[in-house]
Amino acid sequence: MVFEGHLVGTELKVGVVVGRFNEFITSKLLGGALDGLKRHGVEEADIDVAWVPGAFEIPLIAKKMANSGKYDAVITLGTVIRGATTHYDYVCNEVAKGVASLSLQTDIPVIFGVLTTETIEQAIERAGTKAGNKGYESAVAAIEMAHLSKQWA
């Protein structure tokens, strides 16, 4: 038997957590995610967005959303761009680990849509120009995973 999640978002409730740091990028990711959710049938009233200060704060609010019982999936969006110090490595590692563990802890799909790029240009490319919009891709993944995970509920 083959199991697949379909891409119809009607009747799904989705939480989105967005890091405000690098907002000129994260706002584009959010726009892409909202577009993806709505294009696939998720009603605007069924989408909640929580802004947090930066990427490092994303896992806590994503966990609270996932544990609330109100959402079929949670999308995390942020942008971490390498600077001159090792701070980038610590933030990227902790955010990735934090978000990755949430689906296993909560049984709710928590989608990792946090950009970790070497340059501003790479981030811009992934927020709606050359490399598509990772926010949109995260929305599609959330819909698919919400349906797929319900097959074993």
Curated annotation (Swiss-Prot):
Example of a GO cellular component annotation carried by this entry: cytosol
Reactions performed catalytically: (2S)-2-hydroxy-3-oxobutyl phosphate + 5-amino-6-(D-ribitylamino)uracil = 6,7-dimethyl-8-(1-D-ribityl)lumazine + phosphate + 2 H2O + H(+)
Keyword Membrane appears in the UniProt entry: no
EC numbers on record: 2.5.1.78
A GO MF term: 6,7-dimethyl-8-ribityllumazine synthase activity
Transmembrane segments: none
UniProt entry tagged with the keyword Transferase: yes
Principal EC category: transferase
Domain of life: Bacteria
Alphabetical list of Pfam families matching this protein: DMRL_synthase
Binding-site list for 5-amino-6-(D-ribitylamino)uracil: 21, 55-57, 79-81, 112
UniProt xrefs under InterPro entries: LS, LS/RS, LS/RS_sf
Binding-site positions, (2S)-2-hydroxy-3-oxobutyl phosphate: 84-85, 126
Pathway: Cofactor biosynthesis; riboflavin biosynthesis; riboflavin from 2-hydroxy-3-oxobutyl phosphate and 5-amino-6-(D-ribitylamino)uracil: step 1/2
GO biological process: riboflavin biosynthetic process
UniProtKB keywords: Riboflavin biosynthesis, Transferase
Active site, per annotation: 87
Family: Belongs to the DMRL synthase family.
Assembly: Forms an icosahedral capsid composed of 60 subunits, arranged as a dodecamer of pentamers.
Main function: Catalyzes the formation of 6,7-dimethyl-8-ribityllumazine by condensation of 5-amino-6-(D-ribitylamino)uracil with 3,4-dihydroxy-2-butanone 4-phosphate. This is the penultimate step in the biosynthesis of riboflavin.
Name the UniProt record assigns to this protein: 6,7-dimethyl-8-ribityllumazine synthase
